[in-house]
Amino acid sequence: MQTLQKRGSMKVEVNSASFADAVAWTTRVIDTRPANPILAGLKIEASNGTLQLSAFNYQISSLNHIEAGVDEEGSVLVLGKLMAEITKSLPAENTYLSTENNILTITSGKSTFTLQLMPIGEYPDLPTLPSKLGQVDAPTFIQAVNQASVSISREENRPVLTGIRMQFEDDTVTMTSTDRFRLSRSTFKWTPENNDTHATTLVRGSLLRDIARSFDDHQNVVIDFNDEEPTLLGFENSGRTSTSQLIDGEFPSVDRLFIDEYPIHAVINRQALINAIKRVSLVAERNAPIRMIFNNQELTLSAGAADESQAKEVLDIDMDGEDITVAFNPLYLIEGLSAITEPFVHMKMATAVKPVEFNGQQEADGDESMNYRYLLVPMRFNN
């Protein structure tokens, strides 16, 4: 027979808001319909003035610590999603947890809830956190993940394309993703634990994005990785720890797609370009391209065909090089441009069929930033 609790009755007092926040963060990794019913559980452990909450789905784990008044230590496993719903609506400042006869009682003000305990002995152990690799401030990391994740593929049959490759080279981290039609690369500086740091990982993009969204942006992000056991990546931030299983596979060789010299350059107000693309693409059929005609310091955006609805808009630009016409998937354009944080976008072009590079630029007459590079393959179009 499985044991429902490791220890005797648990008695805890905890701040309701802190508890609700911790439960919500921890249970976000619990699947709505887990393959193994035990993975629907939230593990709660009380000891030494701390309440530890954890959840796991074999791909990603979450572990959270909050302060609590622990009268009696204990460990329980309860339905995580139900606990999250309950804690969202707790009416009083403090909440009391106690266990008796395989029941967890939650009391807050005049509200009382009881939950059946799940067999804690059946719950899998969380992965062991790898050794510390380095750290970076949270806003920098979050922005880099948001930019790099633009080009992750949704094709589950090619797992490597759903991932973000993270390359750690001394004080520089480079994140790259591609779905074969576009490529996103973000680069940032960080503080490595050791001066001679060299590691490459491939982590599922959607998981990395979910982890990054949960960070406290006032605290640093510690990244954990062990070359001897290169199957797991860990993240620590503000008392919260997440791990993610890595993708087993070889990321495509994409470095050759970036070229040093482009013959055609154009600098455009980023938000004005996004707004114009949204307007012009209203007449475009599904998956139809939007044309970008660069001519005489002007950019003409057009969509539609002669026998269909049409739209056109002209923007003033700063251009250097020969006239050129390229066409793109408007959604891919908007997603790439939206990831740029600078007010101007610098487009670099070679021909109408070769990938176009997009970079952010702080000033219209300044230099482009290489912290984020977005490559987009043009679509073929009819004149």
PLM regions with names:
Residues 1-383:
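Structural preference for solvent-exposed beta-strand-turn elements
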